[in-house]
Amino acid sequence: YIIHPLCVAIILADLELDKETIVAGLLHDVVEDTEVTLAELEQAFPPAVTEAVCLLTHDKSVDYYDYVRNLKPNVIAKKVKLADLAHNSDEIRSKAAGCSEKQILHWREKYSRAKEILLSE
């Protein structure tokens, strides 16, 4: 679990972004992938971080592209998602994990569309 969030945080740090954005990158999947709750994060981190993490936590009942559109107004969430997409789009990583070409193509298209949504006016 920890490698992907660390890589996202490193991408953000390499861009010399602010501390809140880097921390949100580190925590972006924690509510989705662990037992940690948003309420627990709110006790330990500033509102800018927890608001971004809340937005980045994908409610599976919400269409993926609607979820991505909902990130756009929050600058931190938008930057973190772009870094997340960049790391998730690493085809070498996908191939090393044993993913099929079909799955890689699906992800490439999905992440490309998500990036277009985030970068559109």
Briefly describe each language-model feature range.
Residues 1-121:
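Active-site helical microenvironments for divalent-metal-assisted chemistry
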